[in-house]
Amino acid sequence: MPRGDEQRVVDAFCAWLRQDGWTVETEITFVDILAWKDGTTLLAEAKGITSSPGLDVDTAYGQLLRRMPIEPQHGWRYALVVPEETLKAALRVPQRIRDLLGLDVYSVNQDGAVTLRP
């Protein structure tokens, strides 16, 4: 179970998804957040504010890559969810690569507002 600031990020993202009509599960053994809506499955990793934001974001990318199946799954998307303070580190992976992987980056501000980032 996520702790500290990561829990804040998970809670805000899950609330945002539910408000948009997603069915959401957390505390899954292989991913922080699993959600479904209209034939789309979303697997998300979340990170909070830490003393090593670059390392933690790199770890999250690695976790997501290891969860991706060998063959593409129709309707599957992936997400990295980070606090605004960590966004710069999350966007170091070029947009083109994230697009190829079907991976979106979301940020959560201190008020819990969620934003999809380009």
What do these predicted ranges mean?
Residues 55, 61, 108-114:
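Long, charge-dense
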Residues 50-62, 88-91:
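Active-site-adjacent loop/helix micro-motif of nuclease/hydrolase catalytic cores
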Residues 33-35, 39-51, 66-67:
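Conserved catalytic cores of phosphodiester-cleaving nucleases, focusing on short active-site segments
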Residues 1, 8, 19-22, 85-90, ...:
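Nuclease-adjacent, charged terminal/linker segments that flank catalytic cores
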